[in-house]
Every structure is written in structure tokens, then in C-alpha cells.
Amino acid sequence: LLPKLKLDYPNLNLNIIEAQTDVLLNKISSGEIELAIMALPFNTNGFNVHKFWTEDFYWISRKNDPRSKKPSIKAKEIDLDELIMLEEGNCLKDHILDACKIKNTSKITFNASTLSTAIELVKGDIGTTFVPEMAVNQLLVANPELKETKLDEKGPHREIAIISRNNYAGDRDIKSLIDLFTEQLNSNQKIKVG
């Protein structure tokens, strides 16, 4: 996505910040940044929300896990004590818990600070994890010993949106970004590995 963005918009001044959602919203409010790409649901009252993508979650396990042979898996089929989640405060964790309808997290014993750490733990046969659909292809190409299984719970499990201040004047810029992102995400989805 970034090479295409740079190619199509060579004069674009791009400042990429990876942060938790509430930090990004504060930066938008203060004018430190103009836009953010975020996963929803999240409380975005007081901001312009431009939704452009929906996706589901996939359960990631080693290929030798018998459950990975199925085309989909229900949340109740996954042992919480084997589930590797991201640390508290990460919206991906909140979205996964919500999609799986998990209220009591006391049995979840593995917490990783990043998704790449969670994947390394799965590769080491420590447990299993979930990833968003947009990450599946790249993940499986890099880790052929892993297998994705679609989470069979009502979806879509999350939405992706561009968030801006209410007084942001660049609606045409947002439309151009949405078109570019959607094109790239759609082309990525056509390349199925598993």
C-alpha cells in the first residue's frame, strides 16, 4: 500500500504513527495529525468517520492442529487457555473478544505486545491466535507452517475507517485515499494462500 501511495501521490507529506486508538484520536483533536486509519467499533463521537472496509477474523494455528482442517471454527471450539491475545488496551484484542463473545478473560494466560510476537508464539506451538482478514495472506506466505481458519461468528467482525476532525476540509483527499485503500485491499483478497 505505501509504495502505491508514494507512487500515486509523490508530493504527499506522510507522517506514519502507530499508536493506540485513543492516542490517535487525541492527536486528531489537538491538530497534531489530520487523519487516522482506525479499526472500529470504537467511540468516535465528535469526529468524522469515513468507513471503507469490513473484515472478519481468522484463527491462526499450526497446520498440525486437527481443528485447522475445518473451513471455519466457532469461538467455543477454542480453548481460552491456549489463546494468545494482545495486551490490554489494544483495540484488536477488544474486537476479537467482542466477536467471540468472550466476557471472562481470566483463562487467557498468554498476552503479547505485538501481533508478530503472537505469531512467533503460535509458530513455537505455544498456542493459537486471531488475525484480521487483511493480514492473512502476507502472514501465511511468510509462515507456511501456519494455517488460517475463518471464525464462524456473526460478522463482519470489524470495520476500517478514516477518522478526521469535524472541520477537516479535505473530503476530496479522503475520497482519494479510500479509493486507493479499497483497491489495494481488494487486490490483496484475491490472492488466497491457504
Regions found by a protein language model. Name each.
Residues 46-83:
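Flexible hinge/capping segments at coil-to-helix
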Residues 67-68, 82-103, 170-179, 188-194:
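Secondary-structure junction motif
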Residues 1-45, 112:
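Central regulatory/effector-binding core of bacterial HTH transcription factors
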Residues 20, 74, 113-114, 132:
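Short loop/turn segments at beta->alpha junctions
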Residues 40-46, 94, 116-146, 154:
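A ligand-binding cleft/hinge motif common to bilobed small-molecule-binding domains
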